[in-house]
Amino acid sequence: MVGKARSSNFTLSEKLDLLNLVKPYVKILEEHTNKNSVIVEKNRCWDVIAVNYNAIGVDRPPRTAQGLRSLYKRLKEYAKQELLQQKEAQSEFKSSVSEPTKQVMEMIPQIASFGLIRDRSHIQSANLDETAQAGTSSLQVMVDHHPVAITVEVKQEEDIKPSPPLVSNPQLSDTLEQREEHELMHVVEGSESPSLSSVDMRMTSSPSSVPRRDEIFHQESGEHFRSLLRCDPQVLQMLKEEHQIILENQKNFGLYVQEKRDGLRRRQRLEEELLRAKIEVEKLKATRLRRDLPEYSSL
């Protein structure tokens, strides 16, 4: 693994200690924005994490905040790769993944949805292949029962393997079958000549009269898949949490600006009071000086 090779200079206990130290600040560190206040807050968090990490054990080499940040990114990337491999192997990933990956999944639940979305795309493509094969067989049966003797040859690509039995979309399949039936009836009605050779010649010379099923599927399956992603409860929950974090950050930034303004006002008042006090002191000094002079003392 690329992530494992890069972080080989860190032991397993060091990785787990880093994840335990990052856990209280994960909400701030996982906020992806370019706001200056958020960037400053992230840097402050990493400085605190580096100080706490170096204070754990004296036998470990000291680590900088930038080095710990790079290790944290590599651990997240390694967790994604490991989950994807476990998904492809169809094994119980919760019992076979490494301990750092388990902690990353507990801290960032969105990591687990990375493999789910990937699997959903594979299942959707398999559904489309199965529906295409079912539509091809229905087209051949419909031509066999037609009274006009028309030979239609449908060639499938040799490198396509039959997909496993999955749940197909019946509404999409019915719509496509109706379209093909309409196109086929249009071709048959347009050829009323008794000569069968002319019909065969028209069918063989213009293969584009009946649209390819894969082109129709590419057009309609994209919209269907995007609508599935938009309605995914995990994606909606992630968007909701992100929106709440943005609102909370805006609220905190507003409080910070208000406190800064109040502090500037208090500082200005204190400076004015100090200036007035200095003026009073100077007046008292001048009065005392006049009293000490001989010409004023005689008066």
Curated annotation (Swiss-Prot):
Pfam families given in the database record: Myb_DNA-bind_5
Molecular-function annotations in GO: identical protein binding
InterPro entries membership: FSBP, Myb_DNA-bind_5
Main location: nucleus
GO terms for cellular component: nucleoplasm
Cellular localisation: Nucleus
Chain residue ranges for the region called Disordered: 189-211
Keywords, ordered alphabetically: Isopeptide bond, Nucleus, Repressor, Transcription, Transcription regulation, Ubl conjugation
Record's compositionally biased regions (Polar residues): 192-209
Crosslinked positions (Glycyl lysine isopeptide (Lys-Gly) (interchain with G-Cter in SUMO2)): 94
Function (record text): Transcriptional repressor that down-regulates the expression of the fibrinogen gamma chain. Represses transcription of GSK3B gene promoter via its interaction with APBA1.
Assembly, per entry: Interacts with APBA1 (via PDZ 1 and 2 domains).
Name of the featured protein: Fibrinogen silencer-binding protein
Record organism: Mus musculus
